[in-house]
From Swiss-Prot:
The lineage of its organism: Eukaryota, Metazoa, Chordata, Craniata, Vertebrata. The modification Phosphothreonine is found at T36. This is Eukaryotic translation initiation factor 2 subunit 2. SUPFAM superfamilies: Translation initiation factor 2 beta, aIF2beta, N-terminal domain, Zinc-binding domain of translation initiation factor 2 beta. Eukaryotic translation initiation factor 2 eIF2 is a heterotrimeric complex composed of an alpha (EIF2S1), a beta (EIF2S2) and a gamma (EIF2S3) chain. eIF2 is member of the 43S pre-initiation complex (43S PIC). eIF2 forms a complex with at least CELF1/CUGBP1, CALR, CALR3, EIF2S1, EIF2S2, HSP90B1 and HSPA5. Interacts with BZW2/5MP1. Interacts with EIF5. GO terms for biological process: cytoplasmic translational initiation; formation of translation preinitiation complex. Residues 106-117 have a biased composition (Acidic residues).
Length: 333
């Protein structure tokens, strides 16, 4: 009975509980002396019934101790894992940062030949270069240009004085620009209306055309138009007959009678050509002109710009010979 009492003693159960602490041997040195005793008690266990009860108690205690030990181990392991994970995370971040830098550098190097990036980066670099280096050249060029402009302005002011033309008092030849400026200045002095940029419009009465019978037309206001143009009726009559290719004469009412059927538009076109060639000035387009005849030539002299130019003589068109006597004379000749 002494053996039975030793088996069911609560102290023995406690010692068997300490059996389950193999994981804490390193931390607690006292547990090693206690583990030696349960080994001796195993040799004393004689009966199987008692072993079953002891095993059931041991299983319960094992489950509890294992759960406690696992909790302790999980707690320590969690702390240790967190510390290690922090260190690993830092290393990974550093490695990833290095990789990112390498990747960015690798991406930037092949991206340089692209047109868009080259344009953007190249423009910025070129702007910096243009700002740095060409500034001095540009400043020098601007200074030279300003000096040239100032000299030109000074020359223009000096030449525009009352001393005369630019080439006066010097042996140099005059230039085309100087002569052109002189011509325009004289024209502005003589004709101040041109300075304002207003062009004179030559206003003329429209011709009045009336049919006479079936084969003739009458130009009613022929003499009035000759007075407006300041031209002789004979000259205008010769031009009209040559352009129209007909024959005509002035009757007692100072009306021009022309053979053929003509409309008002046709006579207007002929009058416009006559005014353009024999009335308006060829240089200033002024209608204040005089038609003069000198040695079989007609000269048109302008009263505004005092220019004088020759004018072509009026030539009659081809006329067919219809009379019998004229035909015989032509054959004889």
């Amino acid at each position: 009975m002494s053996g039975d009492e030793m088996i069911f003693d609560p102290t023995m159960s406690k010692k068997k509980k300490k059996k389950k602490k193999p994981f804490m041997l390193d931390e607690e040195g006292d547990a090693q002396t206690e583990e030696t005793q349960p080994s001796e008690t195993k040799e004393v266990e004689p009966e199987p019934t008692e072993d079953k009860d002891v095993e059931a108690d041991e299983e319960d205690s094992r489950k509890k101790d294992a759960s406690d030990d696992l909790d302790d181990l999980n707690f320590f392991n969690q702390k240790k894992k967190k510390k290690k994970s922090k260190k690993i995370f830092d290393i990974d971040e550093a490695e990833e940062g290095i990789k990112d830098l390498k990747i960015e550098s690798d991406v930037q190097e092949p991206a340089e030949p692209e047109e868009d990036l080259d344009i953007m980066l190249g423009n910025k670099k070129k702007k910096k270069k243009v700002v740095k280096f060409p500034d001095e050249d540009e400043v020098l060029e601007k200074d030279e240009a300003l000096e040239d402009e100032d000299s030109k302005k000074d020359d223009g002011i000096s030449f525009s004085n009352q001393t005369g033309p630019a080439w006066a008092g010097s042996e140099r030849d005059y230039t085309y620009e100087e002569l052109l400026n002189r011509v325009f200045n004289i024209m502005r002095e003589k004709n101040p209306d041109m300075v304002a940029g207003e062009k004179r419009k030559f206003v003329m009465k429209p011709p009045q055309v009336v049919r006479v019978g079936t084969k003739k037309t009458s130009f009613v206001n022929f003499t009035d138009i000759c007075k407006l143009l300041h031209r002789q009726p004979k000259h205008l009559l010769a031009f009209l007959l040559a352009e129209l290719g007909t024959s005509g004469s002035i009757d007692g009412n100072n009306q021009l009678v022309i053979k053929g059927r003509f409309q008002q538009k046709q006579i207007e076109n002929v009058l416009r050509r006559y005014i353009k060639e024999y009335v308006t000035c060829h240089t200033c387009r002024s209608p204040d002109t005089i038609l003069q005849k000198d040695t079989r030539l007609y000269f048109l002299q302008c009263e505004t710009c005092h220019s004088r130019c020759s004018v072509a003589s009026i030539k009659t068109g081809f006329q067919a010979v219809t009379g019998r006597r004229a035909q015989l004379r032509a054959k004889a000749n």
